[in-house]
């Protein structure tokens, strides 16, 4: 058997991980501006944490979860999404306590797992960045969170982003609409796909966002959920729309958008862009005011979103957005002979301790091969160190782009490399 990675996974090689690190660090800097703090939860949870919160009839639970019984016969699942684990942690660690400032804002990033058909931007192990905000039912919280995602895309340079917006209302509005949708779809049941025929019995709202052609035709004239919002839900949604307008964030009302998870209420949204002629959702979320209670906590309004890192990277590449990656070496030390081996190690360590990125040759190669390595690493400067340099204590530092050079002492390099590099870059 040939040993290779499982289907639907990928190896992140150094040339790729540099992009990921940039996006992750950029994310942290944006979220920090909005006063979000990082939370980390296990990558596996008890099965019920996901099944009961996400919804027993959702595709995630019925088709996509990686679940198993461990050696203690506990039913475990690899996490398929980030919200339920964070809510579980919020309740278990009593973060609803009065001494925790509200709204309590958390972000996370890490791997998720779903058994799906692998394709561009969709893997069985994928990585998600998400935020969860607890303790505010103010529609301004909805808008701030959406605006934070918009701000993130804007600063990252992603173009042609479209915001789709809808409201699922409160439980009473949703129940009224659910019945209206059942009444509309029941006469059309035989025209629906097999999955949607099942959804009609279990969770009819899920028929609305089916990707099957026959289902799309069937729901073309379906009633709009906005017609079933009660006064409370209508006021909330109108406030969200008004504040988005004031911020200059354009959006499209999409009444067929219901999101794939059962815990949402009131505002839901998706950010989409086009990749290869197809619409790709790169960020989605909404309000989930009942989930904390469902996990045994006090009544707590909440709002959040998730976005896939793989999809973000895909969009950046497709749009030709060059990330300002800092992959250059500051200096490469070419080593001439074994007599310079120990001295080269002393020097490279001293330069690193000053905060610079440095490398040296360890393979006892010819100078030409070492200089080629310096070019591959993008080294700003090259130091050639041999027995004579060790003996005299004097070395030549060359600018690897302009070929200008300065002569200095080994001691100066070990204590003030910054001044030498600055002088070299001025020439």
From Swiss-Prot:
GO terms for biological process: histidyl-tRNA aminoacylation. Keywords: Aminoacyl-tRNA synthetase, ATP-binding, Cytoplasm, Ligase, Nucleotide-binding, Protein biosynthesis. The keyword Ligase applies. This is Histidine--tRNA ligase. Belongs to the class-II aminoacyl-tRNA synthetase family. It holds the Pfam family HGTP_anticodon. NCBIfam families: hisS. It catalyses: tRNA(His) + L-histidine + ATP = L-histidyl-tRNA(His) + AMP + diphosphate + H(+). It is an enzyme of class 6 (ligase). InterPro entries: aa-tRNA-synth_II, aa-tRNA-synth_II/BPL/LPL, Anticodon-bd, Anticodon-bd_dom_sf, His-tRNA-ligase, HisRS-like_core, HisRS/HisZ, HisRS_anticodon. Transmembrane segments: none annotated. GO terms for molecular function: ATP binding; catalytic activity, acting on a protein; histidine-tRNA ligase activity; transferase activity. The keyword Kinase does not apply. HAMAP family: His_tRNA_synth. Homodimer.
């Amino acid at each position: 058997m040939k040993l290779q990675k499982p289907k639907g996974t990928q190896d992140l090689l150094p040339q790729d991980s540099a992009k990921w690190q940039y996006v992750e660090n950029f994310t942290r800097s944006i979220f920090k501006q909005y006063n979000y703090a990082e939370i980390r939860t296990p990558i596996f949870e008890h099965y019920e944490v996901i099944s009961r919160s996400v919804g027993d009839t959702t595709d995630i639970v019925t088709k996509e979860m990686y679940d198993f019984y461990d050696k203690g016969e506990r039913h475990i699942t690899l996490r398929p999404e980030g919200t339920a684990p964070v809510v579980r942690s919020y309740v278990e660690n009593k973060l609803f306590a009065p001494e925790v400032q509200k709204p309590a804002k958390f972000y996370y990033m890490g791997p998720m797992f779903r058994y799906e058909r692998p394709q561009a931007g969709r893997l069985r192990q994928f990585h998600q960045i998400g935020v969860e905000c607890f303790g505010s039912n103010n529609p301004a919280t909805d808008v701030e969170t959406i605006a934070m995602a918009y701000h993130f895309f804007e600063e990252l340079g992603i173009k042609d982003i479209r915001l789709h917006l809808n409201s699922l209302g409160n439980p009473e509005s949703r129940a009224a609409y659910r019945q209206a949708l059942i009444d509309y779809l029941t006469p059309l049941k035989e025209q629906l796909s097999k999955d949607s025929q099942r959804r009609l019995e279990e969770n009819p709202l899920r028929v609305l966002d089916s990707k099957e052609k026959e289902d799309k035709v069937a729901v073309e004239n379906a009633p709009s959920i906005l017609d079933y919002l009660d006064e409370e839900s209508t006021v909330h949604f109108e406030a969200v729309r008004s504040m988005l307008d004031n911020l200059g964030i354009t959006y499209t009302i999409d009444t067929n958008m219901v999101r794939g998870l059962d815990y949402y209420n009131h505002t839901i949204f998706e950010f989409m862009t086009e990749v290869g002629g197809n619409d790709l959702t790169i960020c989605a979320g909404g309000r989930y005011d009942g989930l904390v209670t469902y996990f045994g906590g006090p009544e707590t309004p909440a709002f959040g979103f998730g976005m896939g890192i793989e999809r973000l990277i895909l969009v950046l590449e497709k749009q030709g957005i060059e990330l300002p990656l800092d992959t250059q070496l500051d200096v490469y030390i070419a080593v001439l002979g074994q007599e310079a081996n120990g001295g080269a190690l002393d020097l490279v360590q001293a330069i690193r301790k000053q905060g610079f990125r440095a490398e040296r040759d360890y393979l006892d190669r010819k100078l030409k091969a070492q200089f080629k390595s310096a070019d591959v690493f993008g080294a700003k400067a090259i130091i050639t160190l041999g027995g004579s340099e060790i003996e005299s204590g004097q070395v030549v530092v060359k600018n690897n782009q302009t070929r200008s050079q300065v002569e200095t002492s080994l001691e100066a390099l070990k204590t003030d490399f910054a001044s030498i590099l600055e002088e070299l870059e001025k020439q």
